């Protein structure tokens, strides 16, 4: 299950020392840029590496292992014309499959078996972009390694437009739609998208922090019962309560 939480610790009492859930994590850069029109998002991974992020995480007792970058496929305009309104769709599909393969490999490679609990546990994977078109491949790769998957989508935007209703044609506003099973009747068939298999039910997703949705996104989120918490909910309830309710929505088996 994908978990997006603010701190890598077990809950603690006031006088207890925090217990780390993990002592190492893999870091993967995905310098995508073509999912949207602004130049510069590709610089994200390198800027993070040049910052003190690795040092700050190490001070918390977690070693970040740099696994390099997934180099995006960037075809020419002649090789990659608009299809169904999507810009750079062939570059996107080829990049998505590269990302998924790399993420799946890292997840499986880092899985360690705990003989005491008879459970397998993977080191977390910290992925830095890049524009948000990369999210299709990151989730698809996780799903290939761990099919029992839930997603907390922490974002101001839904990113669940489909090619047939997107006003801009920019794929960074569509990455989730390619993976949600209930939306596949809105996804046009393209041969190079065959490897992008829908891996999420609507009930596997919860949004946190929404504040700016397109009309079709609002319709699909409500129609398919996707759990969501707006920024107003975060301000009113507090982030801890929102995260607990979001986790309960996607995985009722969790106990707090």
Regions from the language model: what does each represent?
Residues 4-256:
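Conserved alpha-helical scaffold segments that buttress catalytic/binding sites
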